């Protein structure tokens, strides 16, 4: 059912801890792993967990602005349904009853999916994305849709048509982007887990800014079916959470083969939570010199090295490695992403769905006015750049060279991983 952007409507009952006279963490503060154990042991109910998170949304949203749509009634009904199944002794997944927020470029049947854009302000998808089917099968409780940079183009969540999202640690700071709503919601306790999308850092960067864990999965491991496309060869849906194990839990739930996505890999995926228990001792960790040169903040460099030394102290071996084509990565990314965006966003023309301009004299003018009024400045900038690099006379000079650079970068990483367990960036 359609939900307009709004705050949670009613107050939450007394917290789970207050009812038990405990001075411990609130339910909304706990990890998915801890909550899953508590739910399985019937130490709390999914309704109680969901009420706790909804209460947190109600109290923090005026300050944070992470949500565009809150599905309060649907979430509580879903939580009650999971509690009923648990009471009957049905077999449930680790995610059953866990509240999850969804980035607003992932299609959700019956719930507005805006991509934080005026042009899709009232768009309600008639189908669920593949990852939503997986979450529903796992018994997750969907809280609502999260703010983002318009069409995932940005790095601060300030490019949303609806509102800016603030960093929960300091509202004067940005949460990063484009999955800023997804990261801020987890950091603020407004969701236990969230889904975001990552094209050029849109999960990893806001996760770092908000002090949580975020993963851009291996391309093809998570279906892109139902993800509104930005740059199809780079886009990937991924999990955000409070801990590595939480992220592994959500990743395990959403990965897998999907016949609707031609790039979806045909393979068996392990339970990624088991890998979290692996030993650090014996790992060979690459330290690429190109990532520690000019331009890096001294504080960031110190923090990254501190982690590397901690891993070394736990038995890992640090290995110097060179990835020389890294210097060209950002330029190649902007060319490829903008080129693909200009093609993907051509479908938003006011004919089949989305916003349509009110005034126009002919079909061509309708297209022009709809797109001029419907898209924000950053989206239009990238569409123009993409159209330029794909135009006659410039395709070989820009796009073709960028794709060649992409292949070189991939090969350098592939070669490095022949002798390394991981690369520390």
Tell what function each PLM region has.
Residues 3, 11-13, 18-77, 300, ...:
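An N-terminal boundary/leader segment
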Residues 46-51, 80-83, 296-322, 353-355, ...:
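Acyltransferase
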Residues 53, 75, 247, 285, ...:
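Residue-level signal for inorganic ion chemistry
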Residues 75-77, 85-160:
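Acidic/His- and Gly-rich active-site-bordering loop/insert found
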Residues 95-115, 274-286, 339-410:
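Short helix-loop capping/hinge segments that flank enzyme active sites or metal/cofactor-binding pockets
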Residues 127-257:
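Short glycine/serine-rich loop segments
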Residues 216-307, 364-369:
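A short helix-breaking turn/cap at a secondary-structure junction
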Residues 423-425:
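Conserved small/polar residues in nucleotide/adenosyl-binding loops
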